[in-house]
Amino acid sequence: KPRMIEEKMLILLRQGKISKWFSGIGQEAISVGVTSAMEQEEYILPMHRNLGVFTTKGIPLSRLFAQFQGKMSGFTKGRDRSFHFGTQDYKIVGMISHLGPQLGVADGIALANKLQENGQITAVFTGEGGTSEGDFHEALNVAAVWDLPVIFIVENNGYGLSTPTSEQFRCEQIAHRGKGYGMEAYTIDGNNVLEVYNTIASLREDLKKNPRPILLECMTFRMRGHEEASGTKYVPQELMDEWAKKDPLENFEQY
């Protein structure tokens, strides 16, 4: 579903029927895999490339398209045409644009779950660029100290806006930062939907018995621009070619 919708949205963008679009093409396995492994009543805090969260949660496509086209029947009644919306009915919290702050919101939800002893887990998304914000440190530190049942999912897609990871941080992997917080951390193939699903499903069951935070780095690649108007001229073609061979849909079809 996400890929089909993405392709349609790119057509609508060229037709002038939507004003902008943040594409998640090539990264769909992460949002679909994570959401499929979560329970319907558990909160997820997605970001602007996680269309798969909304489709996997079962939101009617008519409402999604109304939202993206700025119609009154959308979730924000035409006030926003992107992913800055949530829905209590589907337990989705709307994204905060600079991404870091929503990690702290996830801590709050996880704390409520822990106090209520309801066994629910919270999943929150950010990008590798978002980990350079101070909110990332604060959220992970609090979650670690309080043993909050939250999974921090970092979609490492190679670029934060136009800045490559080599100019973002010195550690080899984002997951290595987990040690500094005394937190379990893993790096997985974000283009393999089965690996994403199995990892989240396994962690969920364990966290229900032993509440604690997890840092999960999903390796993937951004195949479009930060948003469609920016393009990808700053990305080496060999990188694009390499990751095109790792397309998550083709991976799953060949399984």
What residue ranges belong to the model's regions?
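Glycine-rich ThDP/TPP pyrophosphate-binding loop and its adjacent helix/strand module
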Residues: 92-255
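Cofactor-binding active-site loop characterized by glycine-rich and histidine/acidic residues
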Residues: 6-146, 164-170, 175, 180-182
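Mature N-terminal segment immediately following signal peptide/propeptide cleavage
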Residues: 1
